[in-house]
Amino acid sequence: MPHAALSSLVLLSLATAIVADCPSSTWVQFQGSCYAFLQVTINVENIEDVRKQCTDHGADMVSIHNEEENAFILDTLQKRWKGPDDLLLGMFYDTDDATFKWYDHSNMTFDKWADQDGEDLVDTCGFLYTKTGEWRKGDCEISSVEGTLCKAAIPYDKKYLSDNHILISTLVIASTVTLAVLGAIIWFLYRRNARSGFTSFSPAPLSPYSDGCALVVAEEDEYAVQLD
């Protein structure tokens, strides 16, 4: 494959990765999702008020699907976000089939309940205890929350991206295409010049002042002197 074409593929891959990233440095990427902790204490009447903090940004309350994700959230809450001791998870108790479900409609494939005992009711919520990483059951009827953890899948919905982010992504793609075209042109010119460098050999034209011509002129001059 020509070097220009290979370079173009690499640049296009980089551009795609940039566009697919989380919308800003506020968000943290892990396992194909973007996470943001909104450090705002809000008064709530029900859990939907908390969800709205996330849905307004094209995300939903956090769901957790494996031990690695749980550990990542715990570590980031402790070191970067400085979250509360008890973080409200994006789940609800469905009395129809007596199971917990995630608000983002993903499957409940993992749990880390510290205690499975107790009766689960319609107003039972799940909390992540950030000291240990275990989950606890609690009452959804809370008056306030100290921060909300939101999660969005990648690619992030572009309608929630800022105008500056869209502009930067567009410029990156345009620059990539331009570089790819220039690379192809340079490669084409290089190949054409390389082929035209092998020209056939042709003898140099005989100069009127070569040795043979000089000898003829000298003989003519000598003959003219004899006639005189």
From Swiss-Prot:
- This protein's GO CC annotations: cell cortex; filopodium; membrane; microvillus
Q: Which Gene3D superfamilies match?
A: Mannose-Binding Protein A, subunit A
Q: Which residues are glycosylated?
A: 107
Q: Give me the Cytoplasmic side stretches, as residue ranges.
A: 187-228
What InterPro entries does UniProt report for this protein, alphabetically? Answer: C-type_lectin-like, C-type_lectin-like/link_sf, C-type_lectin/snaclec_domain, CTDL_fold
| Name of a matching Pfam family | Lectin_C
Which SMART domains does the entry link to? Answer: CLECT
Residue intervals of the C-type lectin domain: 30-149
- Location of the protein in the cell: Membrane; Cell projection, Filopodium; Cytoplasm, Cell cortex; Cell projection, Microvillus
**Keywords for the protein's UniProt record, in alphabetical order:** Cell projection, Cytoplasm, Disulfide bond, Glycoprotein, Lectin, Membrane, Receptor, Signal, Transmembrane, Transmembrane helix
Leader sequence segment: 1-20
Q: Which domain of life is it from?
A: Eukaryota
Segments spanning the bilayer are 166-186
Chain ranges on the Extracellular side, renumbered to this chain = 21-165
What membrane topology does the UniProt entry give?
Answer: Single-pass type I membrane protein
The processes (GO biological process) annotated in the record are: phagocytosis
Instruction: Give a GO molecular function annotation for the protein.
Output: carbohydrate binding
Task: Please report any disulfide bonds recorded for this protein chain, giving both cysteine positions.
Answer: 125-140
Record's function text = Potential multifunctional C-type lectin receptor that may play roles in endocytosis and phagocytosis as well as in cell adhesion and migration.
Cross-referenced PANTHER family: MANNOSE, PHOSPHOLIPASE, LECTIN RECEPTOR RELATED
Give the protein name, as stated in the record: CD302 antigen
Q: Which gene carries the instructions for this protein?
A: Cd302
